[in-house]
């Protein structure tokens, strides 16, 4: 979902100019500019309410809004990837919440740089993220998971952070069921991946 605050400014201004030309002697220019600024301000407030301050990604509120829009359009081939940071509590416990917040910011950047144009990454809560893919497939979803893992490995090998990032991932196709059911399905798959991770890694 995209926002176009510029349009909210330009359109009232154009209407004001046209009205002033049609009705000579009536000044509507400044009023239309003021209305345009009000619309831009409201639009930016809406946008900011959908953005997570730490990761820079869209938030849980936007996820609900976005999925509601997708349900109304009855889009097919919608897939989700649920991601949860492995050992995130250990990062906070060992290095403090400031470093933990930095890890969340780095994950936000990695996800933003990993996703194609038909995918939207969002931070759900804490160390949990979700990516919604439209016009997707099992193959493209699996490829995106591999891309994310590769970019996480690249981050770990090219930075001097005191921690190493790793994420458990679960996937599910959205068939128009309730969001609660969709999240339960994808959560189950994610925890299966996390369980595998902890078979070979310490908590």
What does each model-found stretch correspond to?
Residues 142-149, 153-159, 166-168, 172-203:
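Catalytic-core segments of nucleotide cyclases and related cyclic-nucleotide turnover enzymes
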């Amino acid at each position: 979902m995209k926002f176009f605050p510029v349009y909210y400014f330009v359109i009232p201004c154009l209407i004001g100019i046209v009205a002033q030309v049609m009705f000579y002697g009536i000044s509507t220019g400044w009023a239309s500019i003021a209305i345009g600024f009000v619309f831009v301000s409201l639009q930016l407030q809406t946008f900011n309410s959908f953005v997570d301050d730490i990761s820079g990604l869209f938030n849980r509120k936007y996820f609900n809004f976005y999925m509601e829009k997708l349900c109304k359009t009855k889009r097919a081939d919608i897939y989700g990837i649920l991601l949860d940071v492995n050992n995130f509590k250990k990062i906070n416990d060992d290095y403090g919440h400031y470093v933990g917040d930095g890890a969340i910011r780095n994950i936000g950047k990695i996800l933003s740089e990993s996703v194609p144009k038909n995918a939207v990454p969002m931070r759900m809560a804490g160390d949990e993220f979700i990516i919604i893919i439209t016009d997707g497939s099992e193959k493209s979803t699996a490829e995106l998971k591999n891309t994310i893992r590769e970019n996480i490995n690249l981050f770990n090998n090219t930075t001097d952070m005191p921690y190493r990032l790793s994420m458990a991932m679960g996937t599910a196709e959205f068939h128009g069921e309730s969001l609660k059911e969709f999240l339960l399905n994808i959560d189950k798959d994610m925890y299966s991946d996390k369980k595998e991770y902890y078979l070979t890694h310490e908590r």
